[in-house]
Each structure stands twice: as C-alpha cells, then as structure tokens.
C-alpha cells in the first residue's frame, strides 16, 4: 500500500510504499487547523522498511542528480519560532550515488529497530512529528517529498495506583472532602470519585468537575502556557446540604486526550488536571486543582506479543507539586 500523493515534478513522481503497508494499523491525528489526518502507526523500537519508487512521467527524459537518499526524522517545531526546528532523530540511507536516471526505478530501504522516544503530538504552540523524507539532490533545486508517520508511546505502571483524597474549604463557610479512585488513568479509563460535604454555610448553586490540559512550551522567562478545558462534568445543580455525598463518573474515551508528556527534549510538556469548581449564588467561583497522569495502554493483542514496554513517565510522586488555588 503506497502513501497517498507523491511529488509531481516536471519529470518524475516520488512515492514510498511500506513493506507491511497492507497490514499495518493506521491512526488519526488532528492538525493545528482542526483537520484530521490518517497515517501509519508505529511504536518505539519497531523497524521501518519499504521501497522508494521513482516513476518517470515523461519517457525519454533524463534526470541528472547528485545522489538520492531517504531519512527517518523525528522533529519538534515551535509554532512561534518556526525557523528553529529541532531534530531529535535523523537516520539517513543513501539510495543512489550521483548519476543519471533515464527510467523508473525502485530502491529498497530499512531502518532497523528505530528509537522513537516520544509520542507524536500537535498542540496549540508545538508539533512533534515523525516522517520519512526522500531527497533527490540536484545542482539547483532538490526534489523533496515527506511522508508523515504517527508514533504512540505505550506505558506500564505498577499495581500500586494510589487514590487522591483531600479536604478543602473556606474557614467556617464551606468544608468538603473529595476523592478520586486513582492518580493515574489510561486514555480509555473512567475517573470515579465522590464529593462529600462536611460543612455548608454558603449557598452553592452549581458544581462541576473539569479536565484541564496545560501545554507548557519554552524554558525560563520565555515559557508559554496554553490552558484548554477538555471535558466538563456537572456534579450537581442546586444547593447541597451537610452530609450529602455525590458520586463522580467521567469517561475519558469520549474526549480523546493525549498522554501526559513531561519535559519532552527540554522543549515542552503536556499536563492534565482535575479542576473542581463551585459557584455560589453571588456567582463567586471556588476551585481546587489536582494533577493526574494520563498514559496510553497497549492494545490487548500487543500486550500478548510484547512483554516489555518503555515507560516514558516518571512516578508522579517525584514531580513538583502542581499549582493549587485555594478554595
């Protein structure tokens, strides 16, 4: 199965076909402009192999070149500084020495057990992408074609997955206890919890749980944080009473979040928070944030095939405590 498209130059068309293209799974990714693209899916350590096909469009023509190569590239691009892209992986295979093409040709290539240390990602201010890049080197203008791939990082966690339990409130006015069943959730998981009202002396009109995504790019004074509310779950609409307990069930699968990503190549991070929001009758808002870890669980078939997945996230116990506005 070939990648869609190709380079429609004046002489030849460049196309890439993966050796396992007929059976390899594809994945979707939303671009920065909101469109959904579908590309072949790879995991860390998998080989990438196939053929580069050069098809002449004009028989009898010649194409002089200074060499033909294919690269496997992993790249981070900050949207506010597109001139400063960073390549964290760049593998090169030379396909042909300088010479002349007079007819269509195919070249085999293979990148063995390629390290793909990060998950593919497109956010508000940053893009992390993997792609194959074919270059026909010429004296004046090279012929170049890129083919995107998608990489998913799989993580495993120990059986210990502590619940989150906290008591928060406003002195002599409001005192609540909230509990979430875990601190780490896979992307298709269900957040289960409960809110218990210990003291209620203000009139609460509305209460909701939000899943918030924070994308942090840059370092030091140039750090930029983009905050997005991924999901909202209405806990109650109306005044609670002392002793009331309200259950929480938030299904992550319906919102398609990414995994937590920490300090990716010292360029960016993606973190997730549960934000408990209360609104009183005077429209004052009280909130409390708690960071959680989201991770990608291996498909059942893959879990049986492989016994050792790379764990890319450190324990949440080792990270700095998140900003938590006082309620």
From Swiss-Prot:
Phosphoserine modifications at: 315
Gene Ontology cellular-component terms listed: cytosol; early endosome; endosome; endosome membrane; lysosome; retromer complex; retromer, cargo-selective complex; tubular endosome
Membrane-topology descriptor: Peripheral membrane protein
Domain of life: Eukaryota
Annotated Polar residues bias: 316-327
Subunit structure: Component of the heterotrimeric retromer cargo-selective complex (CSC), also described as vacuolar protein sorting subcomplex (VPS), formed by VPS26 (VPS26A or VPS26B), VPS29 and VPS35. The CSC has a highly elongated structure with VPS26 and VPS29 binding independently at opposite distal ends of VPS35 as central platform. The CSC is believed to associate with variable sorting nexins to form functionally distinct retromer complex variants.
Name the record gives this protein: Vacuolar protein sorting-associated protein 26A
Organism: Mus musculus (Mouse)
Gene name tied to this protein: Vps26a
């Amino acid at each position: 199965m070939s990648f869609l498209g190709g380079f429609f130059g004046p002489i030849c068309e460049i196309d890439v076909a993966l050796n396992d293209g007929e059976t390899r799974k594809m994945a979707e990714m939303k671009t920065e402009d909101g469109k959904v693209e579908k590309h072949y899916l790879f995991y860390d350590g998998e080989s990438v192999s196939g053929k580069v096909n050069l098809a002449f469009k004009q028989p009898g023509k010649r194409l002089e070149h200074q060499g033909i190569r294919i690269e496997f590239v992993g790249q981070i691009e900050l949207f506010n500084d597109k001139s400063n892209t960073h390549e964290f992986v760049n593998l090169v295979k030379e396909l042909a020495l300088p010479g002349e093409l007079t007819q269509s040709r195919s070249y085999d290539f293979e990148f063995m057990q390629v390290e793909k240390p990060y998950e593919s990602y497109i956010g508000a201010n940053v893009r992390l992408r993997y792609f194959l890049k074919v270059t026909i080197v010429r004296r004046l203008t090279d012929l170049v074609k890129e083919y995107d791939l998608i990489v998913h990082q799989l993580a495993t966690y120990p059986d210990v997955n502590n619940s989150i339990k906290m008591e928060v409130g406003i002195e002599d006015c409001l005192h609540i206890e909230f509990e979430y069943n875990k601190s780490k959730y896979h992307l298709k998981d269900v957040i289960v919890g409960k809110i218990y009202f210990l003291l209620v002396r203000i009139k609460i009109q509305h209460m909701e749980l939000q899943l918030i995504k924070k994308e942090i790019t840059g370092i030091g004074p140039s750090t930029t944080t983009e905050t997005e509310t991924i999901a909202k779950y209405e806990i109650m609409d109306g005044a609670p009473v002392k002793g009331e307990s309200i259950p929480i069930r938030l299904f992550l699968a319906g919102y398609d979040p990414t995994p937590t990503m920490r300090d990716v190549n010292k360029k960016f991070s993606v973190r997730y928070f549960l934000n408990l929001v209360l609104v009183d009758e005077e429209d004052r808002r009280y909130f409390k944030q708690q960071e959680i870890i989201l991770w990608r669980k291996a498909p059942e078939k893959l879990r049986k095939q492989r016994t050792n997945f790379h764990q890319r996230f450190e324990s949440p116990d080792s990270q700095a405590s998140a900003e938590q506005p006082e309620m």
